[in-house]
Amino acid sequence: MEEGKNWIVVPTWRVPGRMERWHSLVKHLKYRTKDLEEVRYVPHHKVGWAWWTCSRVIFPLEGESHLEIQAYWNLTPEKGWLSSHSVRLTWYTEKFWTDVTPDCADSLIHSTYFSCFTAGEVRRAIRGEKLLSCCNYPQAHKAQVPSLQYLALVVVQQNGRPQRKGAARKQWRRDHWRGLRVARQDYRSLKQGGSEPSAPRAHFPGVAKVLGILA
């Protein structure tokens, strides 16, 4: 009797298109800006026996926990789904693991990586002083109920930069997408074999935004 197939079912998030944008952004933030210096990036040729895995990105978090973003490809070749990818988002410790949503993944990453407003910024904003810190991961706050202090600091951060009159909002949008732009530029430079000087620390657009996840 012929043995049937053994299926492994895990929750995944489908990603339209290819994964170069995600890989380029991770490598840019790990090797150039050093924002993700402690993150472990495992490309497909180093994964080993898991041939369906395109890459693994492991974020060490606080308290000996980790967040892993594992990208899959060639999931159902018998149905012709060769050009599609998906990702699995897993939070785990030594004795426990669970799958998380992109919003939760953003919050976990922001709790360890990328700076946010410090406690003293509210007092500085009230006194009309220049803010000494800013939030480089605004997408991580999207799923949360924002406090009045956070909303006020966001407004100060957007409008308090030295910009021409009426250009502050447009500049904020440019900064929000800068992470994607530098990722594309970094990917092109790697393909051409060139090298560029280190770029300044960039805002992180968020896991769902970068991957283009379709819920």
From Swiss-Prot:
GO terms for cellular component: host cell cytoplasm; host cell plasma membrane; membrane; virion component. It is a peripheral membrane protein. Residues 154-167 are annotated as: Multimerization. A motif (BC-box-like motif) lies at residues 147-156. The keyword Ubl conjugation applies. Its main location: host cell. Processed in virion by the viral protease. Highly phosphorylated on serine and threonine residues. The modification Phosphothreonine is found at T98. GO terms for biological process: viral life cycle. A motif (HCCH motif) lies at residues 110-141. The modification Phosphoserine is found at S147. The keyword Membrane applies. Counteracts the innate antiviral activity of APOBEC3G. Forms a complex with host APOBEC3G thus preventing the entry of this lethally hypermutating enzyme into progeny virions. Functions as an adapter molecule, recruiting APOBEC3G to the ubiquitin-proteasome machinery. Targets APOBEC3G for degradation through the assembly with elongin BC complex, CUL5 and RBX1. Binds viral RNA and affects the stability of viral nucleoprotein core. May play a role in viral morphology. Belongs to the primate lentivirus group Vif protein family. Homomultimer; in vitro and presumably in vivo. Interacts with viral Pr55Gag precursor and human APOBEC3G. The interaction between Vif and APOBEC3G is species-specific, which may play a role in restricting the replication of HIV to humans. Forms an E3 ligase complex by interacting with human CUL5 and elongin BC complex (ELOB and ELOC). This is Virion infectivity factor. The lineage of its organism: Viruses, Riboviria, Pararnavirae, Artverviricota, Revtraviricetes.
